[in-house]
Amino acid sequence: FVEYSKNYGCDCGITVCGQYDEENEFHVEYTFPFFRGTGITTQEHVVVERHSEKESYAGACDDLRLGVTLIFYLQNLAEYMQEKYKGLKDPGDRPVTVSGLASEGKILFPLQKDKEAVKVERELSKNRTNLIAAARNGDEEAMESLTMEDMDTYSMISQRIVTDDVLTIVDSYFMPYGIECDQYNVLGEILDIMKFKNILTGEEICQMTIESNDIQFDICINSKDLLGEPAVGRRFKGTIWLQGQLHY
């Protein structure tokens, strides 16, 4: 099994996967677009499973910050298979870098928050993550605390939704989209922006680092599919195909 990757911009391009036969002739099995992100997104336990229709793989891990199972399309397939043939059955707690290819997106204005509110919000998020971890281990008090917290949140939203817009109440979200398990609808704050040209088509590509539900990752989108002008501090809302790279 062999994979070839060709960059058409900054860490984005096309990967061709296939096999060589006995006469050393390459046979293409499938291709997919890729975008490689930066940094380490998560170091939770990762499980990798093969797709039924072809020799491609999906990774999954439970990150408590999200509240949902993070499922991504594995980018470095050849490297994973090489490690697998060496006897590594499970990648375990390998660092993972996830990134998103966005099919469409919008730029939203940020919510107005002071430094103290941001500090309190981060502390509450950290406490909630600890409660979820404890609840998974059977802690009944943690389960009760989470239930009460959800009820308070529901009550607050029910009151504010009468006068406020949903995107004014919700700062960010990360939730599954459609029937494909590795597609998500995300809303997050833009932390960094870089624009470049596709060297083949000349189209402008916008690459952004966003923070959604306390998780930072990079996304890539064709500028013509993006509504609004991106800027640091504003928010990105859109649909992404989540890809991931295991680090060995």
What does each of the following model-derived ranges do?
Residues 223-238:
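Short nucleic-acid-contacting surface segments enriched for D/E, G, S/T with interspersed K/R
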Residues 177-189, 234:
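Short coil-to-beta-strand transition motifs
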Residues 2-178:
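Long, hydrophobic alpha/beta structural blocks
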Residues 72, 218-223:
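Short amphipathic beta-strand/extended segments with alternating polar/hydrophobic composition
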Residues 241-248:
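Short, Lys/Arg- and Gly-enriched loop/turn segments at beta-strand edges
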Residues 191-219:
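OB-fold (S1/OB) nucleic-acid-binding surfaces
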Residues 188-193, 239:
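Compositionally biased accessory segments in Actinobacterial proteins
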Residues 175, 194-196, 224:
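Eukaryotic intrinsically disordered and solvent-exposed regulatory patches
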